[in-house]
C-alpha cells in the first residue's frame, strides 16, 4: 500500500541525476511528489528524469555557476510557484595529502560542496513554503578525521555548520534544516 507522503508537495532535488540525489529523487517520486531534479549534464539529466517517471521535471544547473542558480530559481518559480522540500545533494569528492592540493582543487571542491549549496538556498528561500524543509547532504568526513582528504572534510564540516546556523535562523520562519551525513 502506497502512503504517498509527498502527494501534492513540490520537491527540488539539486544533484538529483546521480548517486544519493538520484536515490532520494526516486523515493520522493514514489511517494507522490511533484519532483524537480537538477544536474550539470543535460543528457544524463533527461535520461534520469525519464527513468524516475511520475511528475518529474528536469533543469540543467551547475551549482558553481551563479547565473545558472538564478535561472533555476526563475524556472522553478514559474513552473511550481513554491517548494516544500529543498534537498541538496550536488557535491564532489577529492582525496590527496595537503601537499598535493592545488588552489584550483580547493576552489572546485569548496565551490561545489559549500558555496553552491549556500547560494542555492539563498536563491530558493523566497520560494520556500511554511512549513518546509531543507535537507543538505553532508558526510561523516565533516565530523570525524579522514586521512588524505583535508579539503573534502573541510567542505563537509562547512555544510554541517551551515545547516546548524540556518536551522537557528529559520526556526521562526517554519523552515526546518537538517544535514544527512553518510
Specify the residue positions occupied by each region the protein language model found:
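Active-site helix of classical SDR
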Residues: 121, 155, 163
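Alpha-helical segment proximal to the catalytic Tyr-Lys
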Residues: 126-127, 168-172
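The beta1-alpha1 cofactor-binding region of Rossmann-like NAD(H)/NADP(H)-dependent oxidoreductases
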Residues: 61-72, 103
Amino acid at each position: 500500500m502506497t502512503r504517498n507522503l509527498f502527494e501534492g508537495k513540490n520537491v527540488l532535488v539539486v544533484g538529483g541525476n546521480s548517486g544519493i540525489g538520484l536515490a532520494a529523487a526516486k523515493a520522493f517520486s514514489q511517494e507522490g511528489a511533484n519532483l524537480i531534479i537538477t544536474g550539470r549534464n543535460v543528457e544524463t539529466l533527461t535520461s534520469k528524469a525519464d527513468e524516475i517517471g511520475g511528475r518529474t521535471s528536469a533543469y540543467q544547473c551547475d551549482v558553481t555557476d551563479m547565473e545558472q542558480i538564478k535561472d533555476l530559481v526563475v524556472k522553478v518559480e514559474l513552473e511550481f510557484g513554491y517548494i516544500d522540500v529543498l534537498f541538496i545533494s550536488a557535491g564532489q569528492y577529492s582525496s590527496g595529502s595537503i601537499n598535493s592540493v592545488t588552489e584550483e582543487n580547493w576552489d572546485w571542491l569548496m565551490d561545489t560542496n559549500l558555496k553552491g549549496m549556500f547560494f542555492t538556498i539563498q536563491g530558493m528561500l523566497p520560494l520556500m513554503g511554511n512549513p518546509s524543509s531543507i535537507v543538505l547532504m553532508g558526510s561523516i568526513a565533516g565530523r570525524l578525521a579522514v586521512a588524505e582528504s583535508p579539503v573534502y572534510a573541510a567542505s563537509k564540516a562547512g555544510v554541517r555548520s551551515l545547516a546548524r546556523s540556518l536551522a537557528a535562523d529559520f526556526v521562526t520562519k517554519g523552515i526546518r534544516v537538517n544535514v544527512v551525513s553518510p
